Amino acid sequence: MSFRESDILITTAQELPGYKIVEVKGVVIGITVRSRGLGGNIAASFRSLIGGEIKEYVEMAEQARMQALERMIERAKALGANAVISVRFDSNELAQNMDEIIAYGTAVVVTKSI
C-alpha cells in the first residue's frame, strides 16, 4: 500500500482510544471493480474440483480491498481528516466475472487526549 501508517489513523471502532474527535468531515468511500480473468477462472474451477483454497481469488480479493481502502483514505485526506472511524468493507457482483469492492467509513479530525 502506498500510504504510510502515520499519515492517517484507521479503525473499525467508533472511537480511537487516546484521541478526541473534534470534527466530523463526513462519509468517505473508496471503490474498485475487478474482473476475474479467464485464466484465473480456469485455475479456480480446477481447484474447486479437488477442494482447498482458491489462491488466485484470495490474492485478487486482498489487492482489491487494499485499493479500495487506499482510495477511501485519499478522499479522507482531501477533506482534511486525519482519521477514519467505523471502517467497513462491502462487495457486490456487478456482472458475471466482475466484482465491486467498497471501503467506507467516517472521516474525522482527532486530537490526542490529555
Curated annotation (Swiss-Prot):
Domain of life: Archaea
Pfam families: YbjQ_1 (PF01906)
SUPFAM superfamilies reported for this sequence: YbjQ-like
Family: Belongs to the UPF0145 family.
Name of the molecule in the record: UPF0145 protein STK_10800
Source organism of the structure: Sulfurisphaera tokodaii (strain DSM 16993 / JCM 10545 / NBRC 100140 / 7)
Highest classification ranks of the organism: Archaea, Thermoproteota, Thermoprotei, Sulfolobales, Sulfolobaceae
